[in-house]
């Protein structure tokens, strides 16, 4: 396996540093996740050690060892319909990733969105949102707080753009993945405005101005967009999605 060399180190030095670059770093991480999700992939192990900086200062996602593929059914379930094992790093895992019975929910963008919320909270405050987790003794309480959505709001009182960050964390750290922010675009809308634009951008799906389109969210064509109005215009009135049997 060959990967791009990232000479700038990982995200750890920025945790709780108060750096003015943190909103920009968050934006770059989200753009990376967006590129991943539009291709049907879910990272499932987002944490400081897995975000590296290139020589130009751009943040890059790394370590896809336990990434999930929405296009592969066996990523989501074993032959019994339940996940084989629990993978990930407990401090950053959403409740459904810890629950063996909810394995199908871990191959959704909402898994990474929860992990991003934990990571962004740690970047801003220097601490984890659900309390200390320096040893196994604190794990059960940490997970209980995560399951209840009991993240430490007091840590945000001194932050600039506090209300925006609160809304972002409320949407990212919701314990119910169905009520959580459903896409990276939603998270970006709540990210405090920054003046600097990243040098590199991930894939962004085209937008339609007139007419209708359909975006495939499951299967081998995940992320593909069909411009329905154009198809109808040229006489194609039957659109077959998926394999013909």
Predicted features along the sequence, with ranges:
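Activation segment signature within eukaryotic-like protein kinase domains
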Residues: 25-26
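Conserved C-terminal C-lobe helix
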Residues: 160-173
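Protein kinase catalytic-loop region centered on the HRD/HxD motif
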Residues: 31-41
């Amino acid at each position: 396996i060959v990967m791009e060399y990232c000479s700038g180190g990982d995200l750890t030095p920025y945790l709780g540093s108060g750096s003015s670059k943190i909103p920009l770093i968050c934006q770059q991480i989200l753009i990376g996740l967006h590129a991943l999700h539009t291709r049907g992939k879910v990272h499932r192990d987002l944490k400081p050690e897995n975000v590296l900086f290139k020589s130009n200062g751009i943040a890059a996602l790394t370590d896809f060892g336990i990434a999930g593929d929405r296009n592969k059914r066996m990523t989501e379930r074993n032959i019994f319909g339940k996940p084989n094992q629990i993978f990930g790093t407990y401090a950053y895992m959403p409740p459904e990733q810890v629950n063996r019975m909810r394995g199908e929910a871990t191959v959704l963008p909402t898994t990474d969105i929860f992990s991003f919320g934990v990571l962004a909270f740690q970047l801003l405050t220097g601490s984890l949102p659900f309390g200390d987790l320096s040893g196994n003794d604190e794990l059960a309480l940490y997970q209980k707080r995560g399951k209840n959505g009991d993240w430490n709001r007091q840590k945000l009182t001194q932050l600039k753009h506090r209300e925006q960050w609160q809304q972002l964390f409320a949407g990212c750290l919701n314990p119910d993945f169905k009520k959580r922010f459903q896409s990276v675009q939603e998270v970006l809308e709540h990210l405090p405005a920054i003046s600097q634009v990243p040098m590199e951008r991930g894939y962004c799906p085209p937008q339609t101005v007139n007419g209708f389109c359909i975006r495939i969210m499951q299967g081998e064509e995940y992320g593909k967009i069909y411009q329905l109005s154009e198809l109808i215009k040229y006489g194609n009135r039957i659109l077959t999605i998926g394999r013909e049997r």
